[in-house]
Amino acid sequence: MTIPSNRPRVGVLALQGDVREHLAALGDAGADAVPVRRADELATVDALVIPGGESTTMDKLARAFGLWEPLRARLAAGMPAFGSCAGMIMLAARVVDAAPGQETLGVLDITVRRNAFGRQVDSFEADIPLTGLDGGPLRAVFIRAPWVEETGPDVEVLGRVPSGRHAGRIVAVRQGAVLATAFHPELTADRRLHAFFVAMVAAQARV
């Protein structure tokens, strides 16, 4: 994928999770990547990545740092976003097995199941073919990952587990300017998915 000549400013929600890895991947993919911990930092970015981590903890920290309502407002206004693992849960409209009191940002018309693939000891890797991504399947790392149980009519399914006991489970989706994966693309050296998102952000900026 061709990296855009301009450099979109992409934030990574830096409350918990694989922040450093996402920043490095976004930089390699052609973005001006910056950590976001405060509302004033959120206001300076063109798009946001919500990393893996623990979704209930990130929910609480976003509120504690005064980021929850600004996040909702920016997303409602059309800011592009990319959520990986816990980030997918935070972007989803509905969560099965949600923790008591857990809320989400609700911008993706999907139902996700928390920890669907099992516990930490059940972590695994798989090669996932992704719609729109050239170069063959993407090596995907699943760690206490969710999966998508239902999608709304405006949601495009980009990837499913191709084989094994979880074959057919939805693990990558897109709805407009919002992208989400159940796996951790930042934990491999393959930057294609981050480049795909950076290109999405650049295209949105041209509209």
From Swiss-Prot:
Task: Identify the PROSITE patterns for this entry.
Answer: PDXT_SNO_1, PDXT_SNO_2
> Keyword NAD, does the record have it?
no
Q: In which pathway does it act?
A: Cofactor biosynthesis; pyridoxal 5'-phosphate biosynthesis
Q: Read off the CDD domains from this record.
A: GATase1_PB
Its Enzyme Commission number(s) read 4.3.3.6, 3.5.1.2
Top-rank taxon of the source lineage equals Bacteria
What this protein catalyses is: aldehydo-D-ribose 5-phosphate + D-glyceraldehyde 3-phosphate + L-glutamine = pyridoxal 5'-phosphate + L-glutamate + phosphate + 3 H2O + H(+); L-glutamine + H2O = L-glutamate + NH4(+)
Residue numbers binding L-glutamine: G53, E54, S55, R114, I143, R144
List the GO cellular component terms. Answer: cytosol; glutaminase complex
Q: Which residues form the active site?
A: C85 (nucleophile), H184 (charge relay system), E186 (charge relay system)
Instruction: Give the record's subunit note.
Output: In the presence of PdxS, forms a dodecamer of heterodimers. Only shows activity in the heterodimer.
Q: Its biological function?
A: Catalyzes the hydrolysis of glutamine to glutamate and ammonia as part of the biosynthesis of pyridoxal 5'-phosphate. The resulting ammonia molecule is channeled to the active site of PdxS.
Protein name per Swiss-Prot or TrEMBL: Pyridoxal 5'-phosphate synthase subunit PdxT
Tell me the organism: Acidothermus cellulolyticus (strain ATCC 43068 / DSM 8971 / 11B)
